[in-house]
Amino acid sequence: MTDDSVPPPSYEEVLRQEGVIDSPNSSNGQTSTSAGHPSSSSSTLPNYAASSLNSRPVSSSGSGNAYSQAPYPPARPTSQRPNSWQPGNASTMYASPPPSSNYNTAKPPYQTSQFYARPQSSYAPPPSGRPRISYPYPPGYMCYKCHNTGYKDSGRPCGRCARRFGRSYDVQFSRPPPGALVVYPGDPRIPGRVCGNCKGSGQLDFIFFTEICPVCNGVGKIPY
């Protein structure tokens, strides 16, 4: 036969020839001594398995760890700032500045008993040059704006009293006769006193319209 007809050797035969594993006869004679398990001798293990077990790194420090641990990086130096505080006398550290002769630190004592009372409104006489308005006030009535004087504290006529107690002229709206004197409402030449409702203008101005004063009927004055 030629060499091509011979089958190639198997993987186990190659290992036996190289001495990696033992033959079946030698392996059958060895039995385990503990509970039927194979012996833990390294002679029955393959050479590559034994070499892999023996090649495990052992810690050089002798702490018993199977694997060596990487050493920790060195600690970084911490920059320490110089301490500017110097132990000394506390009175010198927190001493107040010396008083200056130009600065007056004395303050007048606060008077807690002092209080500001609102001045009470008094019945002021009517402004000079204006006659006192005498409305027909009912008994016991007191106006809080003018105090029954007809004029407020600002000197302007009281519209509240004029609307409630004022009388008006009998006005007829027509063309004036020839030669009549034409004056504006509230003119000083018109007899009477100034109307407190319209303040002598004879009309009331609203946001969108203007109407004639209902107290003085547009004259600007009311009779005494």
From Swiss-Prot:
InterPro entries: Hua1-like
Annotated region described as Disordered, given as residue ranges: 1-110
Keywords in alphabetical order: Cytoplasm
Compositional bias (Polar residues): 53-68, 77-94, 101-110
Induction: By stress.
Cellular compartments per GO CC: cytoplasm
Subcellular location: Cytoplasm
Chief location: cytoplasm
Family statement drawn from the similarity comment of this UniProt entry: Belongs to the HUA1 family.
Protein name as catalogued: Proline/serine-rich protein C17A5.10
